[in-house]
Amino acid sequence: LFDGMNTVVSQFAHLPHGICSQNSQLNIRGVLDSYGIGDLFKSVVGYDDVSNGHQKPHPFGGVKCVENIFGVDQANELCLMYIGDHEADTQFARNIEAALGKNAKVIAVAAGYSRSEPENWQTKPDYIANHVDDLLTIIGKYT
């Protein structure tokens, strides 16, 4: 976990959390549990939960994560935030929004604090968090 992320997750504990990652579900849950925040994540979708043809940036895993948290009926009426450190994550967020359709909105946040360079990406995020603390302000705009 990036330094300060525990604070961000805890401050917004009242919001439903999920993870969709190219890591394995077991590894993700192990890290979350080691920081004492595993119970805050209602859904964790790892690469091992998604078939090879449906890996990111295909929206399948993201939609599965959202539906696990909110149910199928509510999934297309939500405002969601997806935070990622690769350009493919921003494309993934756009693909989830398109797959959910209707009134769903997925806000893409690039984790610039991970030494990525989102200002050079072709697929632009809605926000760039250059420091973990920036997430407090970005998420706060929508709560």
Task: Give the label of every model feature segment.
Residues 7-8, 34, 71, 116-119:
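Short, flexible, glycine/charge-rich loop motifs used to bind or transfer phosphoryl groups or to couple energy/partner
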Residues 8-11, 65-68, 138-142:
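CheY-like receiver
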Residues 18, 22-81, 87-98, 104:
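Substrate-recognition "cap/lid" segment bordering the active-site pocket of phosphatases
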Residues 37-48, 116-140:
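Structural recognition of alpha->loop->beta junctions
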Residues 4, 61-65, 134:
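Well-ordered alpha-helical segments embedded in enzymatic catalytic cores
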Residues 82-128:
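Acidic, Mg2+-coordinating phosphoryl-transfer loop and its flanking beta/alpha structural elements
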Residues 6, 24-26, 38, 87, ...:
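Alpha-helix N-cap/helix-start and coil->helix boundary motif
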Residues 1-19, 25-29:
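Short, acidic loop-to-helix structural element flanking the phosphoryl-transfer center
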